[in-house]
């Protein structure tokens, strides 16, 4: 299990615990005060044997407890069931056919209550937020495609529908286009998808008159929308780039045949020029600047730079440690496999003789600060962004695997105040929001789909999303670390007040990711058990923190959070793990293919969730940040936190501060 997934499991389990046990200052209701207590657990010790890395498990198994995996059973909403005979809900027998027929998706003129006779979609095809109490169920705005289709035929059906103008309005056509572009990879690989599009256009050239023109317009519209959506991703898919270029040349040759498409073909020309397609191997690639990841060398000039999106071909620097804690620094592609990384290590170590034998003798291990060790398989790739906050890569032989120990803690108790005591809450909150907005903007909307649906499609890197999840974990541990490293009781109380103020300003900035992370950090069991410290907190701050806990309460499918975010207007930063949970609910609540036929409802629901993410980023973020003398210093501090992520160590610090607190 990856460290970021452990974080999701740990934090959501902790939130669930508040529904049963309240901490100091807790009031009646689902949630108490600053979280429930807990014994020194978590963190885990060294593994007993070589354990292969389990990459990217299903999020529904990670976001525990059960209410994060199962649909809510609110009054009037029934959980997904199977009809008699074992047929999945949403599939019925077509009269006279003897086979299944997909549930017809008729246009619903307006929201109607359950039981009113209005056709409703299967609950299993909705994300968990769509099943929130009081929210009407609605079918897609476009009419059914007709007979059920297999993956290889669905694209032609959509193109024929667009060419025939059978959609009811232009907005329905736009949604239909967006649905198929965003979700085609769930049932058809991108390269195959483009091949089908290419073939459809070639066949359309043999059709004369308005019908042929309509087909070409449909093909061009789909290609334009595809390029708009996939900008920045196609450089990793060389095969797709070649097909696009071939189709582009065919379209440009046909431009003289129909003047009506001149504007669209001009736009296509501009898009093809701007889309970053993969450079052929025979050409000389341009020199690339090495991009910094989190916590790499802690260079001020690197952390102050505006974050840009990572792609698999980007190069980074990374340290790989030896069992004696010496290290070599390698330069590697972000998407490099474990075998490639070990090859670079052996080259650095100057293992010139018997290279094959030497490389096979080395293994790559991820070692967490808790001592947990995970053996990385040679075929694994993109391992750099899957590491935990204070995890490191070790290269060793199998004989020395058991002797591996984590590096010494990088965060030490130092005399005097740390940086957090010297900065203003507003400055910290604004810099948190600004940095997290940069990271959120770097995440391509399709990374959310790829992260959850990786089992049904070809692999594509999700490095930017993984880094954003790591950052959420980092902020949570930063809050706990700063509180537990403060030995003076009075200053600890001031820190609690400061973090509550930071959470309030982040909420005001509509940065719900930072807000959640700070609240969860204060709810860390090692912090919430400090009863004497919490008792000294002024009542005004206790009440404010109770409200914040209520907002992060997972009761009733995170109802409080969903109500708050539904009233916000962009720009805003959502709590990203909850989006992944909703997508996982969609993924596991209904099949993508039933008897080989594509579940259109599921595709539309997934696309709706992606469009929600798109809406959050539809406007630029504008923060009023004064250029104070300490502006750059605060910015650097916020972007390179030094934290303790070993829960056992956090509990040790907590018991040193208050040994008898419960």
UniProtKB/Swiss-Prot annotation:
Pfam families: RasGEF. Residues 424-660 form the Ras-GEF domain. Residues 49-65, 116-133 have a biased composition (Low complexity). InterPro entries: Ras-like_GEF, Ras_GEF_dom_sf, RASGEF_cat_dom, RASGEF_cat_dom_sf, Ubiquitin-like_domsf. GO terms for biological process: small GTPase-mediated signal transduction. One of its GO terms (molecular function) is guanyl-nucleotide exchange factor activity. PROSITE patterns: RASGEF_CAT. Disulfide bonds: none annotated. The keyword Metal-binding does not apply. Residues 1-149 are annotated as: Disordered. Residues 20-48 have a biased composition (Gly residues). Keywords: Guanine-nucleotide releasing factor. PANTHER family: GUANINE NUCLEOTIDE EXCHANGE FACTOR, RAP GUANINE NUCLEOTIDE EXCHANGE FACTOR-LIKE 1. Probable guanine nucleotide exchange factor (GEF). This is Rap guanine nucleotide exchange factor-like 1. It comes from Mus musculus (Mouse). The lineage of its organism: Eukaryota, Metazoa, Chordata, Craniata, Vertebrata.
